Curated annotation (Swiss-Prot):
GO terms for molecular function: alanine-tRNA ligase activity; aminoacyl-tRNA deacylase activity; ATP binding; tRNA binding; zinc ion binding. Binds 1 zinc ion per subunit. Zn(2+) binds at residues 596, 600, 700, 704. It comes from Methanococcus maripaludis (strain DSM 14266 / JCM 13030 / NBRC 101832 / S2 / LL). This is Alanine--tRNA ligase. Its EC number is 6.1.1.7. Belongs to the class-II aminoacyl-tRNA synthetase family. The keyword Isomerase does not apply. Its cofactor is Zn(2+). It is an enzyme of class 6 (ligase). Catalyzes the attachment of alanine to tRNA(Ala) in a two-step reaction: alanine is first activated by ATP to form Ala-AMP and then transferred to the acceptor end of tRNA(Ala). Also edits incorrectly charged Ser-tRNA(Ala) and Gly-tRNA(Ala) via its editing domain. It catalyses: tRNA(Ala) + L-alanine + ATP = L-alanyl-tRNA(Ala) + AMP + diphosphate. GO terms for biological process: alanyl-tRNA aminoacylation. GO terms for cellular component: cytoplasm.
Amino acid sequence: MEINHDYRVKLFDELGFERKQCTECNQWFWTLDKDRTTCGDSPCDEYSFIGNPITSKKYTYNEMVKEFTNFFDEKGHTPVKRSPVVAKRWRDDILLTIASIAVFQPWVTSGLVKPVKNPLVIAQPCIRLNDIDNVGRTGRHLTCFTMGAHHAFNSKDDYKYWTDKTVEYCFELMQRLGIDGKTITFIESWWEGGGNAGPCYEVITHGVELATLVFMQYKKIGNDYEEIPLKIVDTGYGIERFAWASQGTPTVYESLFSEIIEKLKEDAGIPEVDEKIMAESATLAGLMDIENVGDLRVLRQKVAEKIGMDVDELDKLISPLEYIYAIADHTRCLSFMFGDGIVPSNVKEGYLARLVLRKTLRYMEKIGISMSIKDIISMQLENMKEIYPELSAMKEYIMDVLDAEEKKYIQTVNRGRGIVERMAASKSEITLDDLIELYDSNGLPPEIVKDVVDDLNKKGKKTIAITVPDNFYTIVAERHEEEKPEEVVSTKKELPELEVSKTELLFFKHPTQVEFEAKVLKIVEKYVVLDKTLFYAEGGGQKYDIGQLNDIEVMDVQKKNGIVFHKVSDISKFKEGDTVKGAVNWDNRLKLMRNHTATHVINAAATRVLGKHVWQTGSNVDTEKGRLDITHYERISREQVKEIERIANEIVLSKMPVNSTFMDRNDAEQKYGFTIYQGGVVPGDTLRIIEIEGTDVEACGGTHCSNTSECGYIKVLKTERIQDGVERLEYSTGMGSVSEIASLEDTLIDSAEILGIPNDQLPKTVKRFFEEWKEQKKTIEELQKKVGELVKYELADKFENVGNYEVLVEQVSGTPNELMSIADNLAVGNKLIVLMNENDYLLCKRGENVELSMKDLIRNIGKGGGKDNLAQGKYSENKEQITEKIIQILNK
């Protein structure tokens, strides 16, 4: 469709704004200044607020949040609480909250759910890591920023306001702050994002963009646009930029973190830098519209020229201060990440949090800050507690996770040298892909990799090329920032699309009913589709019900698009239009109900024991056992497992009612928060809420007990670390727990009988046997070492000279460990050892001066694998044939 948007609004006519075209960039803009020829934005105009505040008073960040919110509150906008910076809490397409409108996507913006208030105002903290390498260097970039926004959701039945009022509000707010109206320009622009589009104004003053006013009204389909029924006012005001412009500091960082910056400078012993230098750098950065690291190098050169200083001297002077700016920004970002419950890991939002944390730790090391990162983040929490008290409430978790992560980082750095050396041994260049692999797989920052390679180049025989891009962290963050849907491999045949009404789910109204009558709507292969059913279809981690339809076995139950498919053992017994009698297997259903309710109980107990950061990442509810996956930053200890189990059974014995209600989505979120989505994001404007009184509330479509006592005894069977940052708890309920406890008791009694001791002596006896075994193992290892030394002398005369190497190929009687001990004694200098035993075991080991890869060698003379200096496997040819092959390889 053709779009011709008129950017003229009522305010422009009333106040005499003129529409002009910028002589520098050719963009159209509106201004009160009749003499203006440029649009006002950088790089067409430079920053003119540095050292020259543009408001009638200076505002701190906290004051600006209040000023913005109060203004729109007065204008009839209801203030709403911020959402977490973890967008994954309510949507499954992005990991972090990147804009205020993200809070209302996809449910409100699609029209499926009404907004919680309309119109509304919000000050939403956001995180974007696509410019993380620019933070500290340009004077304006932040990883964490607050988007002040007023939103109006206009429909035919509920129209609020559109372009006229939006522009009027913006201009009035800026004038109330004391900004000269003649300095304000409204640039005509166009916005697209998330499949939507619309015209917008970029609101500029003194060279800096302070707000964007978007009028979301189109859906983008390919290269075309289609009008959407909901017309959305989507504004974004840069709260930090308003505070910066009101203070006129050299960079945005001084306006936000002045106290922290001063303490970090003092701690690191960094000399004062002339404010004019930093102001010049920030001003030129604005003029250059920094987008990449190449621009940053040019920026440094331009600043040096402007102030008459050598570029290397300038770099030495301001780089430490730029690191401090980045540390101040990153620690605020981490305060929100961890305060909103992110658990560091090697995937998804946990990966991004760890990236920011390790980059911060590296910068702290680089400039010699002795203050701990916990101290810095404690200052951030203190500064923000007036506006964000909920972050301070998470301080204990934040401090614990920082401790755990700092230890992991130190361990990573300590083992990093060996990892890099092994990679470098077979390479002439460490590429960007290598650096990313070392970071993703081993957590090694690229700066450490470069330090190791530089050392190797000084000592080694060859030169290994390496270049660390200045935007390395931006590159890896962008690879991980978007949520990628997990690939689900299903062994089940895809269910067909059917044009029949959705199946009525009777078990919601009648959870204990087991028999019903229904009409057959469709027969599809082995599936029967009914108009209503008591059978629960597999979903939400819970297994399907089993039972009978007209005495024919129901083997599987699945659901697609609200239609339930019943797989039966004999489809020939059913016809479309028939009325059938169904019966759910109650014993099977009861086991599923117990285990599903227990899942909620254990999740609540784990949260009490481990902390509010605990978040369910998956579950599996079967008849025999249940499984719950939760986020946690370290292994769950035995004592913690016992406490989780104790609390869970306390809840069971308390006979807490389990209530099921259907609620409006907004009402549920407002009442209970986003923790209702522990089991995953649930679509629709109405949610089924399962509330265990005083214990747990979740949006859930599963079958549950009527009170917790019906679960019976809950037994946590085991825990395991299924991935970094995720713990799995496996448990049983009721008679399943009785069986598990009986099995454990049998194991205990059988073990005691084998050892011929009373049950209560088992731990003590096993400990004694274990200590004795360790001593015997140590003795055996010492004997093996001595045998190896003796065999060394026996084999010393059996080496043959082949080219530049001394080669030994020998069949030796012994275990793999014994052969390894022999090879360790012999493999020095230019010696190459190949040993075989009577069980077809093959071992290849080289001395430090042998360049041939043992991994490659073993593949040519047998089967196996390993590393360049050591390989193990199997052989099938005799000693003479293997020797001949080795000679041929070495003589090539």
